[in-house]
């Protein structure tokens, strides 16, 4: 029996009344853009796309050539379809409505065009993360303020990981599903329906070089992980860290674990490293739809009411029981 394609999957979701035609079209166009990005990434040095672009983004980060190219691909692909009202990107200062010459739709698209791009030059897996919201009714030209909706309002979220194979991992609010790009056919085929994150784990993903900057609750939590079976947790833990959120979260969706990017004192003015709207929210939706959990260490990420388009948050996501344990350390410390 042949595997269902992404196109068939989306049509069946529409027939079941779970999505409408506009959302189906939007996801289809995003997936096509991801194929183009996958081709560009796979060419590497041969495509002349590696290295710095010589520009910076609103985050103050140096842009890679592939950051800029991936952003342009997503903007161009989604401009003319009539399904989108506006889009926002990690690489742009402000949101961008669809051009006046094209029809406007009902949805808002947010994306990190190439997460983990600092790893591009060393051939580590990178990816595209995206989130879909509904545009508020009666809005002719959506601006930044119309994107400021809590993650619970997402109607779809996903990422495309460019690794040994290219995979699109998607949720429409009814489970998390993985599709693998069949390059000869040019189609994404369903390879894992209803992914499930194990409730318990013995793996954690964190950048330990920042340990000296963590708050006491975080120090205590990781200290107990490092103590292993001789410590309070009573079992040994392994650490995994790729420094590409898409790659680390993909591993967790596949076999469990907890991904952690906590607040630290390196820049106390920033509440976290990762961006809420186009990193934390879509990844949290994917993980929760797979039976996992996602918090800031103190509150559920999807419940946060955003106040800024490029807002940052601490992130703890993955296996439900381990996320609850990490959160408990922080909440207990707050009560002390």
From Swiss-Prot:
CDD domains according to UniProt: FBPase
Reaction equation(s) it catalyzes: beta-D-fructose 1,6-bisphosphate + H2O = beta-D-fructose 6-phosphate + phosphate
Assigned keywords, A-Z: Carbohydrate metabolism, Cytoplasm, Hydrolase, Magnesium, Metal-binding
GO BP: fructose 1,6-bisphosphate metabolic process; fructose 6-phosphate metabolic process; fructose metabolic process; gluconeogenesis; sucrose biosynthetic process
GO molecular function: fructose 1,6-bisphosphate 1-phosphatase activity; magnesium ion binding
Residue numbers binding Mg(2+) 1: 90, 112, 114
SUPFAM superfamilies linked: Carbohydrate phosphatase
Enzyme class: hydrolase
Co-factor remark: Binds 2 magnesium ions per subunit.
Subunit structure: Homotetramer.
Family per similarity comment: Belongs to the FBPase class 1 family.
NCBIfam families: PRK09293.1-3, PRK09293.1-4
Protein name per Swiss-Prot or TrEMBL: Fructose-1,6-bisphosphatase class 1
Organism: Xanthomonas euvesicatoria pv. vesicatoria (strain 85-10)
């Amino acid at each position: 029996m042949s595997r269902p394609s992404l196109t068939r999957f989306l049509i069946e979701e529409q027939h079941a009344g779970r999505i409408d035609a506009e959302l189906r079209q939007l996801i289809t166009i995003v997936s096509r853009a991801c194929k183009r990005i996958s081709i560009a990434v796979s060419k590497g040095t041969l495509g002349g796309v590696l290295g710095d672009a010589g520009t910076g983004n609103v985050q103050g980060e140096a842009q890679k050539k592939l950051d800029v190219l991936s952003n342009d691909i997503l903007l161009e692909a989604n401009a003319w379809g009539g399904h989108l009202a506006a889009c926002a990107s990690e690489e742009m200062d402000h949101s961008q409505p669809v051009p006046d010459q094209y029809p406007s739709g009902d949805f808002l698209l947010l994306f990190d065009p190439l997460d983990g791009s600092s790893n591009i030059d060393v051939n580590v897996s990178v990816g595209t993360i995206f989130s879909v919201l509904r545009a508020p009714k009666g809005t002719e030209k959506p601006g930044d303020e119309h994107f400021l909706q809590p993650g619970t309002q997402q109607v779809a979220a996903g990422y495309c990981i460019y690794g040994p194979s290219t995979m699109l991992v998607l949720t429409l609010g009814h489970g998390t599903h993985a599709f693998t790009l069949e390059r000869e056919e040019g189609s994404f085929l369903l390879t894992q329906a209803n992914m499930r994150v194990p409730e318990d784990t013995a793996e954690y993903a964190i950048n330990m070089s920042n340990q000296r900057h963590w708050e006491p609750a975080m120090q205590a939590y990781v200290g107990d992980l490092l103590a292993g079976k001789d410590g309070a947790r009573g079992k040994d833990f392994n650490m995994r860290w790729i420094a590409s959120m898409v790659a680390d979260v993909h591993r967790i969706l596949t076999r469990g674990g907890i991904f952690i990017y906590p607040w630290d004192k390196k820049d106390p003015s920033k509440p976290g490293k990762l961006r809420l709207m186009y990193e934390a929210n879509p990844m949290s939706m994917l993980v929760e739809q797979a039976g996992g959990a996602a918090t800031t260490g103190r509150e559920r990420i999807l419940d946060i009411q955003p106040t800024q388009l490029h807002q940052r948050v601490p992130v703890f996501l993955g296996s439900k029981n381990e996320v609850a344990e990490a959160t408990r350390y922080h909440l207990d410390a707050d009560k002390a």
